[in-house]
Amino acid sequence: MFKKLFGLGSKTNEETIVAPLTGAVKNIEEVPDPVFAGRMMGDGVAIDPTEGVVVSPVDGEIVQLFHTKHAIGIKAKNGTEILIHVGLETVKMEGEGFEAHVSEGQAVKAGDKLISFDLELIREKAKSTITPIVITNTDAAESIKTTVGVAATKGSTEVMKVTMK
């Protein structure tokens, strides 16, 4: 009762996800990959980046950094687990053109630089530069609200609001 009366509790369950990249925000269904478009990895959005920098979309912890540096997992303070997968079929690049600025277990704040990448090299060597940002523990979420069709600025534009159960 007190939680509802004083607005306690609800704030800890809700997480605002800001854009980890600068670019056009798209519906996850627009990703030209059936695994992401079919939400098999989780619900979310995708960004078609205009620059090669990924920043943290939340305050949280780096829980996974792929050795090829093309993807990173972050756990927000409310338990939301976020996967940022730079481009499609970029794993085949074996880390070429990617640089990590964080390591697993590291605490991060929204806007902290996580990965930098060579956008032109990805255009040349991978299927697409489109970058899915998905909530991998979608089943633990009460609601996921997405904002698509906007031009996002990394570290500031809200792209999702996730409320955990």
From Swiss-Prot:
Main localization of the protein described in the UniProt heading: cytoplasm
Active site residues per record: H85
SUPFAM superfamilies: Duplicated hybrid motif (SSF51261)
Cofactor(s) required for function per UniProt: Zn(2+)
Modified residues (Phosphohistidine): H85
The keyword Phosphoprotein is assigned to this record: yes
Residue sites binding Zn(2+) per the record: H70, H85
Keywords: Cytoplasm, Kinase, Metal-binding, Phosphoprotein, Phosphotransferase system, Sugar transport, Transferase, Transport, Zinc
Gene3D superfamilies xrefs: Glucose Permease (Domain IIA)
Site, as annotated: Important for phospho-donor activity: H70
Cofactor remark from the record: Binds 1 zinc ion per glycerol kinase EIIA-Glc dimer. The zinc ion is important for dimerization.
Compartment(s) of residence: Cytoplasm
Domain PTS EIIA type-1: 33-137
Alphabetized PANTHER family for the sequence: PTS SYSTEM GLUCOSE-SPECIFIC EIIA COMPONENT
Quaternary context: Heterodimer with glycerol kinase (glpk).
Function of the protein: The phosphoenolpyruvate-dependent sugar phosphotransferase system (sugar PTS), a major carbohydrate active transport system, catalyzes the phosphorylation of incoming sugar substrates concomitantly with their translocation across the cell membrane. The enzyme II complex composed of PtsG and Crr is involved in glucose transport.
Protein name (record): PTS system glucose-specific EIIA component
Upper classification of the organism: Bacteria, Bacillati, Bacillota, Bacilli, Bacillales
